[in-house]
Amino acid sequence: METATSVAISISCLLISFTGYALYTAFGNPASGLKDPFEGHEDWSDQ
C-alpha cells in the first residue's frame, strides 16, 4: 500500500472515531449528567 493511502485511511479513521465519540458524549449515556444552562432562568429580554 502506498504511504499516502495509509495516511489518508488513518486520518479518516481518526476523524470518524472522534465524530462517533462526540455524538456518544452529546446524546448517549454521559449526556444525562449534563445540565442545561438555560433551564430555570427567566427571559430578560421582555424587561
From Swiss-Prot:
InterPro entries: PSII_PsbN. Pfam families: PsbN. Keywords: Membrane, Plastid, Transmembrane, Transmembrane helix. It is a single-pass membrane protein. GO terms for cellular component: plastid membrane; thylakoid membrane. The chain crosses the membrane at residues 7-29. It comes from the Eukaryota. It is found in: Plastid membrane. May play a role in photosystem I and II biogenesis. Belongs to the PsbN family. This is Protein PsbN. It comes from Aneura mirabilis (Parasitic liverwort).
